[in-house]
């Protein structure tokens, strides 16, 4: 992996039978020549969301909340405010599955700032969420109708934990999640052991450059610091029903519920659990999550039925947000002894369905859904080019705008395709078409993330009218 991609430092761990095999690579800090060890402290970024989800499910186990409770029933620090009074309430279930209708950016004017305006400059105090969301957190879509990855939903879950328990989230996680699992070097706030911390880097033309350290305001979504040793203990617990050799944090049935499909826009795609993404590797059920912060990238994989886990923590990896998930997926397939999915040449096209799937699938919602728009731009168009269906992403990236061939992937289902993303280090991706339950129109679902694009009838018709006859 690291022969193909430049990094400053990396830690990889494979967890089996409650034990971790560890490999360190590169440097934790260039200036001091510190190596990467099992006790190097990394920022794990959005993998923090999985810990916040566990804290929420602990409250559910204790009967302090119900998953279908309106979030506002438990929030004391601020309110979730719908853009349309006709919207239903945002529930805790919605927040756990990124289907709350809350957008990716709470303050659109800050979208071009560091971390989309969710962090503070070095030395600046981190404002409480009651101040950060003092005008309320806007809900821009009917809850439950649209999947949008958002830090603000999990920041809100962290606030619910604090408001229900009367304890700061950092203290609650330490006492009820980290310490029971033996994760003694893990914290939500910056650790005191500065000499053990990895420095985040970005790779420039002249070499690695240390990134400016900024603390996240949306703590429950992205603020945790941890070590490979502690993350190994965490994965061990996730693979053994919520317990490891040090203690337990959840009942096994609760963890099973978290890994089950809780949001699944189409039964043919894996969908989302509570705080975890779902997938499949050669018929093996897998659970995963990625983390991204400036200078740091992280990835965890679990194969619960095989009691196999994998984690990777990286500093200074150029475009690691693209290649780290793909490279670790390759490693996970190898550990499971199964082949990675590939483009098939043995499945025939079905031209009779092309008129159904061809057309425009716009990216709906706020322009502040930056991550989604970085993948699909203003949306996608399915068209026939060279006698075969292609998917054009409406983006300035020339290769995506020219189009990606839609390769049939299932001999029993003509609406399932695969696209080749290997030039970006992403392997292949599965695309599923089906009729939307709500509207009856054609919808496009992605396997990589549970995002849905819906075909626009009027845009597609306008395109047909402009075409020469």
Model-derived segments and their meaning:
Residues 322-469:
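Peripheral terminal and inter-domain segments
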Residues 30-37, 320-328:
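A short, polar/charged loop-to-alpha-helix boundary motif
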Residues 239, 292-294, 305, 315-318, ...:
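Short, glycine-/Ser/Thr-/acidic-enriched flexible segments
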Residues 1-44, 64-66, 80, 134-137, ...:
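Short, conserved catalytic-motif segment at the N-terminal edge
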Residues 19-22, 29, 83-299:
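Short, surface-exposed loop or secondary-structure junction motifs
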Residues 12, 18-20, 41-68, 154-162, ...:
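Active-site SXXK
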Residues 67-83, 181:
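Short, glycine/proline-biased beta-turn/loop segments that scaffold the active-site neighborhood
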Residues 299-316, 443-447:
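Short, well-ordered beta-strand elements
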């Amino acid at each position: 992996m690291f022969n193909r991609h430049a990094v400053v430092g990396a830690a990889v761990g494979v967890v089996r039978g409650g034990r971790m095999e560890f490999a360190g690579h590169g440097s934790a800090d260039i200036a001091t020549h510190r190596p990467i060890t099992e006790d190097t402290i990394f920022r794990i970024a959005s993998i923090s969301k999985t810990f916040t989800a566990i804290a929420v499910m602990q409250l559910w186990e204790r009967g302090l909340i119900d998953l279908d409770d309106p979030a506002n029933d438990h929030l004391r620090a601020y309110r979730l405010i719908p853009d349309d009074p006709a919207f239903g309430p945002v529930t805790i279930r919605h927040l756990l599955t990124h289907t709350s209708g809350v957008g990716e950016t709470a303050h659109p004017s800050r979208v071009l700032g560091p971390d989309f305006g969710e962090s503070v400059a070095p030395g600046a105090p981190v404002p409480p969420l009651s101040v950060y969301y003092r005008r309320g957190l806007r809900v821009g879509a009917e809850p439950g109708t649209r999947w949008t990855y958002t830090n603000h939903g999990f920041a809100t879950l962290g606030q619910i934990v604090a408001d229900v328990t009367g304890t700061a989230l950092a203290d609650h996680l330490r006492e009820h999640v980290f310490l029971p699992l033996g994760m003694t070097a893990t914290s939500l706030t910056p650790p005191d052991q500065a000499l053990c911390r990895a420095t985040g880097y970005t790779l420039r033309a002249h070499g690695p450059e240390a990134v400016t350290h900024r603390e996240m305001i949306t703590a429950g979504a992205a603020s945790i610091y941890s070590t490979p040793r502690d993350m190994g203990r965490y994965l061990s617990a996730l693979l053994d029903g919520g317990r490891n050799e040090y203690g337990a944090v959840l009942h096994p049935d609760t963890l099973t519920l978290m890994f089950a499909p809780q949001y699944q826009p189409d039964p043919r795609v894996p969908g989302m659990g509570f705080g975890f993404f779902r997938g499949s590797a050669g018929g093996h059920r897998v659970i995963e999550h990625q983390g991204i912060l400036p200078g740091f990238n992280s990835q965890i994989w679990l194969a619960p039925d095989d009691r196999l886990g994998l984690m990777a923590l990286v500093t200074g990896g150029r475009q690691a947000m693209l290649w780290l998930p793909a490279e670790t997926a390759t490693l996970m397939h190898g550990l499971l002894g199964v082949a990675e999915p590939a483009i098939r040449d043995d499945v025939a096209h079905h031209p009779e369905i092309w008129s159904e799937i061809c057309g425009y699938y716009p990216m709906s919602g706020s322009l502040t859904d930056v991550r989604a728009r970085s993948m699909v731009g203003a949306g996608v168009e399915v068209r026939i080019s060279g006698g075969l269906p292609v998917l054009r992403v409406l983006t300035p990236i020339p290769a995506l705008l020219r189009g990606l061939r839609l390769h049939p992937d299932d001999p029993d289902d003509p609406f399932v395709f695969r696209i080749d993303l290997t030039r970006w280090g992403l392997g292949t991706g599965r695309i599923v078409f089906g009729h939307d339950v709500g509207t009856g129109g054609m919808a496009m679902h992605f396997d990589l993330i549970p995002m849905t694009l819906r075909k626009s009838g009027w845009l597609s018709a306008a395109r047909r009218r402009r075409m020469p006859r």
